[in-house]
Amino acid sequence: MNQHNSLDSSDITYKTEELLEATTNRYKITVQVANRAKRRKYEDVDIIDDPQVKPVIRAILEMVDEITQPEIISD
């Protein structure tokens, strides 16, 4: 999660576009991002990692990593 601390808005925009380009259904991925962000918000209510990184941005970054680096999940 430390890598997410140094992102600026252009990096976030790039990652969002990368996520949208990697999927065939933009609506479905948007709903998945929203659901993950909502779930993370309520699961991590006691844990304050970084108030600068909003749950939706964290969800986008995690999902891009999962899609572009499948070896993360397979381990």
UniProtKB/Swiss-Prot annotation:
Gene Ontology MF annotations: DNA binding; DNA-directed RNA polymerase activity
Domain of life: Eukaryota
EC number: 2.7.7.6
Broad enzyme group: transferase
Cell compartments where the protein resides: Plastid, Chloroplast
Catalytic activity: RNA(n) + a ribonucleoside 5'-triphosphate = RNA(n+1) + diphosphate
A GO biological process held by the record: DNA-templated transcription
An example Gene Ontology CC term for this record: DNA-directed RNA polymerase complex
InterPro entries registered for this protein in UniProt: DNA-dir_RNA_pol_omega, Pol_omega/Rpo6/RPB6, RPB6/omega-like_sf
Keywords: Chloroplast, DNA-directed RNA polymerase, Nucleotidyltransferase, Plastid, Transcription, Transferase
Signal peptide location: none
Alphabetized Pfam families for the sequence: RNA_pol_Rpb6 (PF01192)
Cysteines engaged in disulfide bonds, as pairs: none
Presence of keyword Chloroplast: yes
Biological role: May be involved in RNA polymerase activity.
Family membership: Belongs to the RNA polymerase subunit omega family.
Annotated protein name in UniProt: Putative DNA-directed RNA polymerase subunit omega
